[in-house]
Swiss-Prot record:
Gene Ontology molecular function terms on file: ATP binding; ATP-dependent DNA damage sensor activity; damaged DNA binding; mismatched DNA binding
DNA repair listed as a keyword: yes
Name of the protein this chain belongs to: DNA mismatch repair protein MutS
Gene3D superfamilies: 1.10.1420.10, 6.10.140.430, DNA repair protein MutS, domain I (3.40.1170.10), MutS, connector domain (3.30.420.110), P-loop containing nucleotide triphosphate hydrolases (3.40.50.300)
SMART domains: MUTSac, MUTSd
Recorded family membership: Belongs to the DNA mismatch repair MutS family.
Annotated function: This protein is involved in the repair of mismatches in DNA. It is possible that it carries out the mismatch recognition step. This protein has a weak ATPase activity.
InterPro entries registered for this protein in UniProt: DNA_mismatch_repair_MutS, DNA_mismatch_repair_MutS-lik_N, DNA_mismatch_repair_MutS/MSH, DNA_mismatch_repair_MutS_C, DNA_mismatch_repair_MutS_clamp, DNA_mismatch_repair_MutS_core, DNA_mismatch_repair_MutS_N, DNA_mismatch_repair_MutS_sf
Tagged with keyword Ribosomal protein: no
GO cellular component terms given for this protein: cytosol
NCBIfam families: mutS1, PRK05399.1
Any single biological process term in GO: mismatch repair
């Protein structure tokens, strides 16, 4: 395109001049330029769209003496193409014809009516119904980060101020924005460079005074103190840029964005990016959604409920009062869940319908769904009436009634409206007398035409005569070619077909004009009445949004009640005393995919028992046992019941996992480097109220290096940090730690050998494992028998070399290396010597003495 626009602008056709003017306003994004029934793309946009969408690249005539590269998509299928582009992280400007071709001199007037970007979509066809779709902005300076997210399809506006890179990375992973705005001065590009939907913005868009002004204008406030964000200077920079971008792309006001909320780390259990990934909360390690915690817990019946549940899972709360209210509601709802859920299912995705209402893009079927939702409210209230629980009563009051709005929509919109208002037939008969009159005139055509056909056929004696209509020529009287010579002179030929002639007569032409006028008037009036419905509904937007949020929460709680009942979960006790005590704990995901019964296990952590050294064979269940502890704690902190016979959960501020690792090739980091980075994060940030899972630390280096690191990390966690720690290891040397430190206990996962086979008992027992069963597991995995046989021989040789009867005994040299805290006499003597004060004879004597000390 650049080459063409460099030429004299006037050398182009008027239509292309119009195109270039509009394209200049949106140089970075694709421009869908409406021409009749198609959206066309030209020049570089056409080439790019052709590649992305796999559509034909053609040429359209010439402009300025050169052929114009062109690609196009039909207007009726545009949503499908937009959805594909948005999923690729692309943005599109939609340019519509707003002038009347019949009255336009020169090109029809056009303008960009909306900009579709990955983070600002609200159309049902473009959104994934069970996932939040977030627009985000990020700011960074020497004090840390400012981060803002907006879900334009609900109006949810959040800000936070992560203090370091690890916290910022965790926020990006938790929120997973579809589109991310960042300043041109942004330094930590490695944090974001692999994300889709990146948008580089000029620095002035992050100006703090402008941000405050924008936000106060949006919320109708004088300052932001009431939202608790007045002092969040970094976050406000990001929020200001984000809000301006949303307004620029939507080309309309955003009345559903009515406030902003500060998210503070201390309000919830903090999890870093590695922990979220390893616990497979909403996404498994392969990137899918199967066999995740969300997959087990999410049987919600509305999409907005599903999205809320996932937000709860990713932000476990530490507000004990709020969690206990959720527990009480779940207990109360268990008896009525089967009766309540069918009504909730009929409510649908009210949250996103309201966003489209606010943006004035709601379609007729959105209004029909809203009406259907309102019709469920009396039944929902009736179901909840017997429950005398504060949290349930609060939800009932927020849901509201909206009888007047339901009545309005029942009177105004037909039962099953068409997709688009421009198709007509949306407003119900009887709602507006004038509309009914115009429709009667238009709809009376068939009776009139039947009468005209019978009259003319009998009058002229032409048995082939019939009256019809088509979209090109309008109304006509058709006579067969064989009888066409018999028509009277006032029949004016309108169209010739192979076997027939079509005519128009003055009476029919006059009626045609009247019918077409009435259809046009009816459609214009219907559009005006439809717009008026928005004006009648929007004053209630705030209460409607509260109602939708309450219904989503009710759906989540009812769903968790059903899950607790179906999956045999128990209500955990949330205690203010430190520690975790679980009886008969189960892994919520693994127990669902196992064919055989899951072996439940206890867990006890307290200030006197703060670290478990976990040993046992590979495949014995160490990782499952550790993860289930973290998941039970997390579930308790979303208010959910848990898979256990009994659970008492004390204060937990963070959950850390150092479980498994893979190379981070994109960042040039080896498995061991990834492992050590995650370990460093734990050692720097864990507290005595943190739950820490450490699985096989130190595997990626030599035995002595790995053992030394594992020992030192365990020591640090147990003695300095005093965190609640599950420490799984194959280094049997670590099983001596309980002898050296208070609060450290050995447990193991049991297994039994029968000849060449091994049976995993999956039960947690006190004490250290007797052996690792590595060769038995290798045989189970299908390692050739000759290799296993050779390994057994080699094992015996190694055991003999270390003077051990079995591999469970501890290498004395390694224990000396790690466990000997006594200072060496030789080293003490050396430190006391002043070499400059010694004669050669004295130096030689000292050398002999030091030799004896070793």
């Amino acid at each position: 395109m650049k080459d063409s626009t460099d030429k004299d602008f006037t050398a182009h056709t008027p239509m292309m001049q119009q195109y270039f003017r509009l394209k200049a306003e949106h140089p970075e994004i694709l421009l869908f330029y409406r021409m009749g029934d198609f959206y066309e793309l030209f020049y570089d946009d056409a080439k790019r769209a052709s590649q992305l969408l796999d559509i034909s690249l053609t040429k359209r005539g010439a402009s300025a003496g050169e052929p114009i590269p062109m690609a196009g998509v039909p207007h009726h299928a545009v949503e499908n193409y937009l959805a594909r582009l948005v999923q690729m992280g692309e943005s599109v400007a939609i340019c519509e014809q707003i002038g009347d071709p019949a009255t336009s001199k020169g090109p029809v007037e056009r303008k960009v009516v909306r900009i579709v970007t990955p983070g600002t979509i609200s159309d049902e066809a473009l959104l994934q119904e069970k996932q939040d779709n977030l627009l985000a902005a990020i700011w960074q300076d020497s004090r840390g980060f400012g981060y803002a997210t907006l879900d334009i399809s609900s109006g949810r506006f959040r800000v936070s101020e992560p203090t370091d890179r690890e916290t910022m990375a965790a926020e990006l992973q938790r929120t997973n924005p579809a589109e991310l705005l960042y300043p041109e001065s942004f330094e930590s590009m490695d944090l974001i460079e692999n994300r889709h939907g990146l948008r580089r913005r000029p620095l002035w868009e992050f100006e703090p005074d402008t941000a405050r002004q924008q936000l106060n204008l949006q919320f109708g406030t004088r300052d932001l103190t009431g939202f608790g964000v007045e002092q969040a200077k970094l976050a406000l920079r990001a929020a200001g840029c984000l809000l301006q971008y949303a307004k620029d792309t939507q080309r309309t006001s955003l009345p559903h964005i009515r406030g902003i909320t500060m998210e503070r780390q201390q309000d919830g259990i903090i999890m870093d990016a590695a922990t979220r990934r390893n616990l497979e909360l909403t996404q498994n390690l392969s990137g899918g959604v199967e066999n995740t915690l969300a997959a087990v817990l999410d049987c919600t019946v509305t999409a907005m409920g599903s999205r809320m549940l996932k937000r709860w899972i990713h932000m476990p709360s530490r507000d004990i009062d709020a969690l206990q209210q959720r527990q009480q509601a779940i207990s109360a709802l268990q008896d009525i869940t089967p009766d309540l859920q069918p009504y909730l299912r009929q409510v649908g995705d009210l949250e996103r319908i309201l966003a489209r209402l606010a943006l004035r893009t709601a379609r007729p079927r959105d209004l029909a769904r809203m009406r259907h939702a309102f019709q469920q409210f009396p039944d929902i209230r009736e179901q909840l009436a017997p429950l005398d629980i504060d949290s349930v009563r609060r939800l009932v009051s927020l849901i509201g009634q909206f009888d007047e709005l339901r009545d309005l929509l029942e009177r105004a919109v037909i039962e099953a409206p068409p997709v688009l208002v421009r198709d007509g037939g949306v407003i119900a008969p009887g709602y507006n007398a004038e509309l009914d009159e115009w429709r009667a005139l238009a709809d009376g055509a068939s009776d009139y035409l039947d009468r005209l056909e019978i009259r003319e056929r009998e009058k002229l004696g032409l048995d082939t005569l019939k009256v019809g209509f088509n979209g090109v020529h309008g109304y006509y009287i058709q006579v067969s070619r064989g009888q066409s010579h018999l028509v009277p002179i006032h029949y004016v030929r309108r169209q010739t077909l192979k076997n027939a002639e079509r005519y128009i007569i003055p009476e029919l032409k006059e009626y045609e004009d009247k019918v077409l006028t009435s259809k046009g008037k009816a459609l214009a009036l219907e559009k005006a009445l439809y717009d008026e419905l928005f004006d009648l509904l929007l004053p209630h937007l705030a209460e409607l949004q509260q109602s939708a949020a309450a219904l989503a929460e009710l759906d989540v709680l009812t769903n968790l009640a059903e899950r607790a009942d179906t999956l045999n979960y128990v209500c955990p006790t949330l205690s203010d005393k430190p520690g975790i005590k679980i009886t008969g704990g189960r892994h919520p995901v693994v127990e669902q995919v196992l064919r055989e019964p899951f072996i439940s296990n206890p867990l006890s952590l307290s200030p006197q028992r703060r670290m478990l050294i976990i040993t046992g064979p590979n495949m014995g269940g160490k990782s499952t046992y550790m993860r289930q502890a973290a998941l039970i704690v997390l579930m308790a902190h979303i208010g959910c019941f848990v898979p256990a016979d009994q659970a008492v959960i004390g204060p937990v501020d963070r959950i850390f996992t150092r479980v498994g690792a893979a190379d981070d090739l994109a960042s040039g980091r080896s498995t061991f480097m990834v492992e050590m980075t995650e370990t460093a994060n734990i050692l720097h940030n864990a507290t005595e109220n943190s739950l820490v899972l450490m699985d096989e630390i130190g595997r990626g280096t030599s035995t002595y290096d790995g053992l030394s690191l594992a020992w030192a990390c365990a020591e640090n966690l147990a003695n300095r940090i005093k965190a609640m720690t599950l420490f799984a290891t194959h280094y049997f040397e670590l099983t001596t730690l309980p002898e050296k430190m208070e609060g450290v206990v050995n447990v193991h996962l049991d297994a039994r050998e029968h000849g060449d086979t091994i049976a995993f008992m999956h039960s947690v027992q006190d004490g250290a494992a007797s052996k690792s069963y590595g060769l038995a597991v290798a045989a189970l995995a299908g390692v050739p028998k000759e290799v296993i046989k050779r390994a057994r021989q080699k094992l015996k040789e190694l055991e003999m070399l270390s003077n051990n009867a079995s591999s469970s005994h501890i290498d004395g040299a390694q224990l000396a290396l790690l466990g000997n805290d006594e200072p060496s006499p030789a080293i003490e003597a050396l430190e006391a010597i002043d070499p400059d004060a010694l004669t050669p004879r004295q130096a030689l004597d000292w050398l002999y003495q030091l030799k004896k000390m070793l």
